């Protein structure tokens, strides 16, 4: 089940986020990637701002995503799934949920992921996102930026 996050979910969201991003950090041999430095206060702030959705398996938080609207653009961020729950369509469902929530308010969705993150790129491209540009961040990390125009009913 996917729905809005509540402040009481912050600790679980942060735990899932850290678990999910450890594999990303390993891909880039960098334990200091930004999502691993997020704090409980950062997660709470996103929740209070109405940006966060969670996926639950019973009472357990198994995934989360943020949708940050600025003008006519929604930036999709921190899409995470608990490592033991991957491959079950949770990431796709979270992405679809944030898009459905914001589709009437925005002209496009944007997001980025690391260039070595093949699973993430497959998910985003499969959901209709197209590459727009690549930004080199370090010698081992480039960010692939993607965007999508909402489907209007």
Region roles according to the model:
Residues 1-15:
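A short beta-loop-alpha structural element at the N-terminal edge
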Residues 15-43:
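Conserved GNAT-fold acetyl-CoA-binding loop/helix
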Residues 40-54, 75:
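A short helix-loop-beta-strand connector motif used in the catalytic cores of GNAT acetyltransferases and
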Residues 54, 60-68, 73-80:
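Conserved beta-strand in the GNAT
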Residues 76-77, 87-95:
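Glycine-rich acyl-CoA binding loop
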Residues 79-86, 113-115:
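A short, internal acetyl-CoA/4′-phosphopantetheine-binding micro-motif in the GNAT/acyltransferase core
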Residues 92-96, 115-133, 138-139:
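Conserved active-site alpha-helix within GNAT-family acetyltransferase domains
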Residues 102-113:
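Conserved GNAT acetyl-CoA-binding A-motif
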